[in-house]
A protein has these predicted regions:
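Gly/Ala-rich beta-loop-alpha elbow adjacent to hydrolase catalytic centers
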Residues: 185, 189, 193
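Active-site loop/oxyanion-hole signature of alpha/beta-hydrolase fold enzymes
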Residues: 140-184, 200, 357
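Alpha/beta-hydrolase fold catalytic core
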Residues: 15-16, 23, 28-113, 135-137, ...
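Catalytic active-site module of serine/aspartate enzymes centered on a nucleophile-bearing elbow/loop
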Residues: 32, 42, 335-376
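Short beta-strand/loop motif that positions the catalytic acidic residue
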Residues: 305, 311-313, 317
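Conserved alpha/beta-hydrolase catalytic His-Asp/Glu region
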Residues: 70-72, 218-225, 239-306
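Conserved HGGG/HGGXW glycine-rich cap/lid loop of the alpha/beta-hydrolase fold
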Residues: 103-149
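Flexible "cap/lid" loop of the alpha/beta hydrolase fold
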Residues: 198-199, 203-244
Length: 376
């Protein structure tokens, strides 16, 4: 069994950092306020009162959104960051099947980059990494089958093979494989990306797998043991990766992240509110990808991966054991491994700058090697 990413974690990290800064500012104002009050002229006070009245409505609207509709605030957050980073949202169709994706840039002399997110996440989980990637790269982040804006159908094949076929349809629709592209996937997305590279070698010029699922370990870690117990007891409503309360959401965040932080109840509630309408689908998907058909698809196909491959893994991953990196390195001929200290399963969220740098450096080394071969 395996698992995936913390959805919305970049929002949480940003919030916690801002809270720390606000705390320092609050101490400063608390110390200085008596002096300010004694010196402030009544007219100046009145001016601030009038200005405060002018700002009251938007401030109240923000506070109301935070307290009453935190899920709306989360959606606004992603809209804002997509806009800031220049990521445009588009749709493309294969027959009657809709794919939703975001992109930046246009295909050029450098390989395009296709990014596949993890279980129960969406294309926007990559924004924290996109922020640190060069703007001259052509980036494409797609919603995986059944997620966010991509079609969700009860007839869809949600197995790893089924998802690989859907991603290939997406690639064909965009003509992304007109020239081999660089493929990146994390967790479940890493599982799909690895199998894709094995099935469609001519599409891919290089591969980055970030703590991918789909490997068979000799011993199960504590988390996998717990999942097996839940599966044996048919208690699928208790899967830790599918929270339905703020408390369960907090537990999932602690499981997937090495960083420990306290998230406000309103944010936790907002994250749960966003997920609850989709939880039945997540349960169906989860059971499909841990089934006998899909469970070890990457393991069964890793020796078929022939392109230069990069493995990135957090050393403190509690979900998928870091020893998986060594397994892949032994089976893939042209493979380099990057292990990150003080990092859990959510590598993309915990270490976005480092992840982006590793990817850019890897692409540069692969590109230089291929150029040297052409000269020879």
């Amino acid at each position: 069994m395996r698992t995936w990413e913390i959805p919305h974690a970049n929002l949480i990290f940003s919030f916690c950092q801002s809270q720390e800064q606000l705390g320092k500012k609050a101490v400063f104002f608390e110390e200085c306020l008596p002096a300010l009050k004694s010196r402030m002229d009544l007219d100046v006070v009145n001016m601030f009162v009038i200005a405060g009245g002018t700002l009251a409505l938007p401030i109240l609207a923000f506070v109301a959104s935070f307290l009453l509709w935190p899920s709306a605030l989360i959606k606004i957050y992603y809209w804002y960051w997509r806009r800031t980073l220049g990521m445009q949202v588009c749709y493309v169709y294969h027959e009657d099947y809709q794919f939703c994706y975001s992109f930046r840039g246009r295909p050029g002399h450098k390989p395009s980059i296709l990014m596949l997110h993890g279980f129960s996440a969406h294309k926007d989980m990559w924004l924290s990494v996109v922020k640190f990637l060069p703007k001259n790269l052509h980036l494409v982040c797609v919603d995986m089958p059944g997620h966010e804006g991509t079609t969700r159908s009860s007839l869809d094949d949600l197995s790893i093979d089924g998802q690989v076929k859907r991603i290939h349809q997406f690639v064909e629709c965009l003509k992304l494989n007109k020239k081999p592209f660089h493929l990146i996937g994390t967790s479940m997305g890493g599982h799909v990306a690895g199998v894709y590279a094995a099935y469609y070698p001519s599409d891919v010029c290089s591969l980055s797998l970030v703590c991918p699922a789909g490997l068979q370990y000799s011993t199960d870690n504590q988390f996998i043991q717990r999942l097996k117990e839940l599966q044996d007891s048919a208690a699928i409503e208790k899967i830790p990766l599918i929270p339905s309360t703020p408390e369960e959401m907090s537990e999932m965040l602690q499981l997937c992240s090495y960083v420990r932080f306290k998230v406000p109840q309103q944010i936790l509630q907002g994250l749960v509110d966003v997920r609850i309408p989709h939880n039945n689908f997540y349960r169906k998907l989860f059971l499909e990808i841990v089934s006998e058909k899909s469970r070890y698809s990457l393991h069964q196909n890793m020796d078929k991966i022939k392109v230069p491959t990069q493995i990135i893994w957090g050393k403190q991953d509690q979900v998928l054991d870091v020893s998986g990196a060594d397994m892949l390195a032994k089976s893939i001929a042209n493979c380099q491994v990057e292990l990150l200290e003080n990092c859990g399963h959510s590598v993309v969220m915990e270490r976005p700058r480092k992840t982006a740098k590793l990817i850019v450096d890897f692409l540069a080394s692969v590109h230089n090697t291929s150029n040297n071969k052409k000269l020879d």
